[in-house]
Swiss-Prot record:
The keyword Phosphoprotein is annotated on this UniProt entry: no
Biological role stated in the UniProt entry: The RuvA-RuvB-RuvC complex processes Holliday junction (HJ) DNA during genetic recombination and DNA repair, while the RuvA-RuvB complex plays an important role in the rescue of blocked DNA replication forks via replication fork reversal (RFR). RuvA specifically binds to HJ cruciform DNA, conferring on it an open structure. The RuvB hexamer acts as an ATP-dependent pump, pulling dsDNA into and through the RuvAB complex. HJ branch migration allows RuvC to scan DNA until it finds its consensus sequence, where it cleaves and resolves the cruciform DNA.
InterPro entries: DNA_helicase_Holl-junc_RuvA_I (IPR013849), NA-bd_OB-fold (IPR012340), RuvA (IPR000085), RuvA_2-like (IPR010994), RuvA_C (IPR011114), RuvA_C_sf (IPR036267)
Oligomer status and interactors: Homotetramer. Forms an RuvA(8)-RuvB(12)-Holliday junction (HJ) complex. HJ DNA is sandwiched between 2 RuvA tetramers; dsDNA enters through RuvA and exits via RuvB. An RuvB hexamer assembles on each DNA strand where it exits the tetramer. Each RuvB hexamer is contacted by two RuvA subunits (via domain III) on 2 adjacent RuvB subunits; this complex drives branch migration. In the full resolvosome a probable DNA-RuvA(4)-RuvB(12)-RuvC(2) complex forms which resolves the HJ.
Biological processes per GO annotation: DNA recombination; DNA repair
Ranges for region Domain I: 1-66
UniProt record similarity statement: Belongs to the RuvA family.
Name assigned to this protein: Holliday junction branch migration complex subunit RuvA
Record gene name: ruvA
Region (Flexible linker): 146-162
HAMAP family the UniProt entry points to: DNA_HJ_migration_RuvA
Length: 212
């Protein structure tokens, strides 16, 4: 079992990274959050992943995280009934453990629909499972450090700027998952943000799709 991986970042795409170590290149599945954190690094930079090594009858897959806390959060979510590894990774891309706990307590299941391709019954299913397992989230939160995890933008941004940045990132990911190239998605999102003040990522995406 592989539990950690340190090596040279050879390739980075939305959803995965290639890490070369010891003459072998590994493909590591990553969240959009991790992708954004790695994107600012110089090419061929050395990175270190905390790895969740998944093995089943279909094969093996490495899921990579930049902090042990993110890895443990992923394990908590994927352990819920009916929530697989890829869905857990999507949740991790958009919500922290604190945010997910707040959503479950407040009853705002619709907030989960910020995740691309998570609508209706799917968001309700995720909400139900999280709600039924609040104790697991409480235990996770009580055992984690209060120090912030790696964030390349949070140190210099105001709360308003951070909210806008997060809205932008979510909209770009949504467009990428709809088939847009990342560069095109970024350009279209920035165009909408300059010309109007959309309230959420879904509104940004709808405006872009309407203009096509």
């Amino acid at each position: 079992m592989i539990s950690g991986l340190k090596g040279t970042l050879k390739k980075l795409e939305v959803g995965y990274a290639h890490i070369e170590t010891g003459g072998i290149t590994y493909e590591v599945t990553i969240s959009f959050k991790t992708y954004l954190e790695l994107k600012s690094l110089p090419s061929h930079n050395e990175v270190q992943f905390q790895i969740f090594h998944a093995m089943n009858e279909r094969g093996q897959k490495l899921f990579g995280f930049l902090t042990e806390q993110d890895k443990e959060f992923f394990k908590v979510i994927k352990g819920l009934q009916g929530i697989g590894e890829l869905t857990a990774l999507k949740i991790l891309s958009f919500f922290s453990a604190e945010e997910l706990y707040r959503i479950a307590q407040s009853g705002e299941a619709k907030e989960l629909e910020k995740i691309p391709k998570v609508k209706g019954k799917t968001s309700e299913k995720i909400f139900f499972e999280v709600k039924q397992n609040l104790k697991k989230l409480e235990l996770f939160l009580s055992g984690t450090s209060k120090e912030p995890s790696i964030s390349l933008s949070s140190f210099s941004e105001t709360p308003e700027e951070a909210a806008l940045s997060r809205k932008r990132e979510i909209a770009i990911l949504g467009l990428v998952q709809l088939g847009f190239e990342e560069k095109t998605a970024s350009k279209e999102v920035d165009k909408i943000l300059k010309s109007s003040s959309p309230t959420d990522p879904g509104e940004i995406i709808r405006e872009i799709l309407k203009s096509l």
